[in-house]
From Swiss-Prot:
This is Uncharacterized protein MJ1488. Transmembrane segments: none annotated. It comes from the Archaea. Pfam families: NAD_binding_8. Disulfide bonds: none annotated.
């Protein structure tokens, strides 16, 4: 089949790499670079990113890693050990150690909640915040997790998504860091597409998608079209109206920091439940020193954008950083706000659009993630669903 793909972000490139083995693939990208919000930005010798945090939520074992191997991508992913720690009263705790901070009654409640979640025996129609709200520390920890992983508060996160996330965590484990950062992944996918005689056309803005007896991207004719741009933007340029409900984008702010001393000892996430805004941070140079100049560390913080006053949100994040570093020398490299047409996710978890519109038209990307898929894992889940469906036609 001849397959046209709109958008060369992670979803479009992953779909293209997997499908180009047996099909003729053409990828259209309006920007002068590939990877969308999953590639590197070189700045003062540091490998910053256009969006992601140089981390894959389920490391070398999750859906993205499996899809990369299926595509034949040569990407090395180092699993984080530990997955993460939680900073409470100036001290780091592993998840299981958090229970020691609770009184007897709260500890009993917490164990009960943790067991219910692991077994999936909870009310799926409530929010994660409602599930946790009887225990103050649990709610703070929950907000830190959903803020870092989903760019949502615990109250904005459906319990149905948390149940699926928990299943995936118990199945695959925690995060990992791709050596070379995000760009190592997207560069490898573009290499595979070209090796399989696929085409990638950069700086080309698609004006129209037409689905009829054949599928069209402007004047190009295809058997199948896959859109990796936002579902809302896709519908605007398409003759098919497929959105039954409007997806809700998630907003966030990332701050990249240079430091010689470092702030984290491990390659996982440091969750910050007591911060005013920052939900967590990582120090990827503990695993891959090539992401910073010699003698330096790259630290990246992430926070959910809680209000529409972006300047205030950034200022609160900077205050958190000052408190976290406690007199250590550091330098702010870059502040990035993800909202409007360049959000964290085009559809927040729980509002994703189905991948399959019809036999000629499909959606991938962070507006069409699989259930319980954190960021790029959700993208990979959606891509695998589309690829399997197309290959079964």
């Amino acid at each position: 089949m001849r397959i046209g793909i709109v958008g060369a972000g992670l979803g479009g490139l992953l779909a293209g790499a997997l499908l180009s083995k047996n099909h003729e693939v053409v990828v259209f990208e309006k920007l002068p670079f590939l990877g969308g919000r999953f590639t590197n930005l070189k700045y003062e010798g540091f490998q910053l990113t256009t969006g992601a945090l140089h981390m894959i939520p389920h490391g070398n074992d999750g859906y993205l890693a499996q899809a990369l191997r299926k595509a034949g991508a040569n990407v090395k992913i180092i699993n984080s050990k530990p997955d993460g720690t939680f900073l409470i009263n100036g001290k780091e705790y592993l998840y299981k150690e958090l229970f020691s901070l609770l009184g007897f009654k709260e500890k009993a409640k917490a164990f009960k909640l943790a067991t219910k979640l692991k077994l999936g025996k909870v009310d799926k129609n409530i929010s994660f915040g409602e599930f946790l709200e009887e225990i103050d520390l649990a709610l703070k920890v929950g907000n830190a997790f959903t803020g870092w992983a989903l760019s949502l508060t615990a109250y904005e996160t459906p319990m149905s998504e948390i149940i699926e996330i928990a299943k995936n965590y118990h199945k695959f484990g925690g995060p990992g860091i791709p050596i070379g950062g995000c760009k190592a992944v997207t560069d490898e996918l573009s290499r595979i597409i070209k090796k399989n005689n696929g085409k990638i056309i950069k700086e080309y803005e698609v004006k129209r998608i037409e689905i009829d007896e054949k599928a069209y991207i402007d004047d190009y004719e295809f058997d199948v079209v896959i859109s990796n741009i936002s579902p809302i933007e896709t519908q605007k340029i398409c003759n098919i109206k497929f959105l039954k409900s409007k997806p809700k984008p998630s907003k966030g702010i990332k701050i990249s920091i240079a430091t010689k001393e470092g702030i984290i000892k491990h390659g996982g996430v440091l969750f910050t439940p007591e911060c005013e805004r920052i939900n967590g941070l990582n120090q990827v140079t503990n695993v891959d020193k090539s992401l910073a100049p010699e003698g330096w560390h790259l630290v990246m913080t992430h926070q959910t954008q809680l209000t529409n006053n972006v300047k205030k949100e950034i200022d609160l994040g900077l205050e958190d950083i000052e408190n976290l570093f406690k007199g250590k020398d550091y330098k702010i490299l870059h502040i990035q706000s993800y909202r409007d047409d360049w959000p964290v996710n085009h559809a927040s978890n729980g509002t994703d659009i189905d991948n399959i519109v019809n036999d000629r038209f499909y959606l991938v990307g962070d507006g069409a993630k699989g259930r319980g898929g954190i960021e790029v894992e959700g993208i990979a889940m959606g891509v695998l669903k589309v690829v399997n469906y197309i290959n079964s036609l």
